[in-house]
Amino acid sequence: MSAIAPGMILLAYLCGSISSAILVCRIAGLPDPRDSGSGNPGATNVLRIGGKGAALAVLIFDVLKGMLPVWGAYALGVTPFWLGLIAIAACLGHIWPIFFHFRGGKGVATAFGAIAPIGWDLTGVMAGTWLLTVLLSGYSSLGAIVSALVAPFYVWWFKPQFTFPVAMLSCLILLRHHDNIQRLWRGQESKIWSRFRKKRPQKKE
């Protein structure tokens, strides 16, 4: 066990360091998400600059790179404390990727994937919380912030032994969103569907 856990932490960080947003944009011939839109290499920004297909590919990959290392460690019998560190390592890789000059994203989808192995019931509640918040407010960042705030309480209800690791993960996500929190407070945050609300050209009579 003592040899497996540190190795899984390193593997999780390396998996997290594979920035799907940058790779998908390169393959699709889109601008670098770090230099376009909001400047964040994540699914929401790829949605703004590249559309739904590219954003969906980024979202799925980002979820999987958090899910697979934690699921593998869970199957090997790693304890909750180490599982939490593995989940955090995957998110740290996404936020500060060694393969992309340490310029990464916010870690929301990767954190969601890392939490998913705890149980499908928790996964459904977390996804529902994010979706409901986004539908009501229009802000993807607010959905992430609210989900991070309530995640430890959900986990305490479903699987209390994972509460502390998930709380650490939530703190990391909230810290990463400090700029978004300030923009939300000032009313300067962009809504997720703002790019689709372009005025149609008026027909000439």
Swiss-Prot record:
Keywords: Cell inner membrane, Cell membrane, Lipid biosynthesis, Lipid metabolism, Membrane, Phospholipid biosynthesis, Phospholipid metabolism, Transferase, Transmembrane, Transmembrane helix
Record text on subunit structure and interactions: Probably interacts with PlsX.
Xref: InterPro entries: G3P_acylTferase_PlsY
One Gene Ontology molecular-function label: acyl-phosphate glycerol-3-phosphate acyltransferase activity
GO BP terms in the entry: phospholipid biosynthetic process
Protein encoded by which gene: plsY
EC number, as in UniProt: 2.3.1.275
GO cellular component entries: plasma membrane
Biological role stated in the UniProt entry: Catalyzes the transfer of an acyl group from acyl-phosphate (acyl-PO(4)) to glycerol-3-phosphate (G3P) to form lysophosphatidic acid (LPA). This enzyme utilizes acyl-phosphate as fatty acyl donor, but not acyl-CoA or acyl-ACP.
Similarity comment text for this entry: Belongs to the PlsY family.
Membrane topology type: Multi-pass membrane protein
Subcellular location: Cell inner membrane
Descriptive protein name: Glycerol-3-phosphate acyltransferase
Spans traversing the lipid bilayer: 4-24, 80-100, 112-132, 138-158
Top EC category: transferase
Pfam families linked: G3P_acyltransf (PF02660)
Catalytic activity: an acyl phosphate + sn-glycerol 3-phosphate = a 1-acyl-sn-glycero-3-phosphate + phosphate
